[in-house]
Amino acid sequence: MVRMRWQAFLDAVRERGEYPTAHEAERAARTVLALLGAHLVGEERAELAARLPETFAMILLNPLQAAEPLDPERFVRATAAWIDGASAETAKWDVSAVLSVVADAAGEDLMSRVLLQLPPGYELLFGRPRPD
C-alpha cells in the first residue's frame, strides 16, 4: 500500500468537511489524529501511519495521552475541546471528515483490525456501516 500524499489527504478532508480553507482542514486532521493515536497500539497503528502523509503519520505515532479509551461520543467531545469554537456537532463533522479519509487510506483489511482496537460504535465515525 502506498503512502497518501499530503495534498491529496488534505484536499479530501477539506472536501468532506466542507472547510473554507486548507488551514481549517489541517487543524481538524491534526486534532483528530492526535486523539486517534492514543487509542491504537502496535502493528495497526504503525501500518495506518505508513499509509498517511508523513506529518500526519508522526502525529498518529506521537499522540495526545488518553487515560482510558474514549467511546465515540466522548471522542467527539474531546475533539471539540481541542478546537477553538467547536461544538459537539461541529466536532462530529470534523471527526467524520478526517476519519473517513483515514479509512479510505487504510483499506478494508487494516480498517477492520483498527476498529477491533476501538470501543464499539466507531464504524460510523469512519464512514463505515455498523456490522450486523
Regions found by a protein language model. Name each.
Residues 10, 33, 45, 76, ...:
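Generic structural marker for isolated residues within well-ordered, non-membrane alpha-helices
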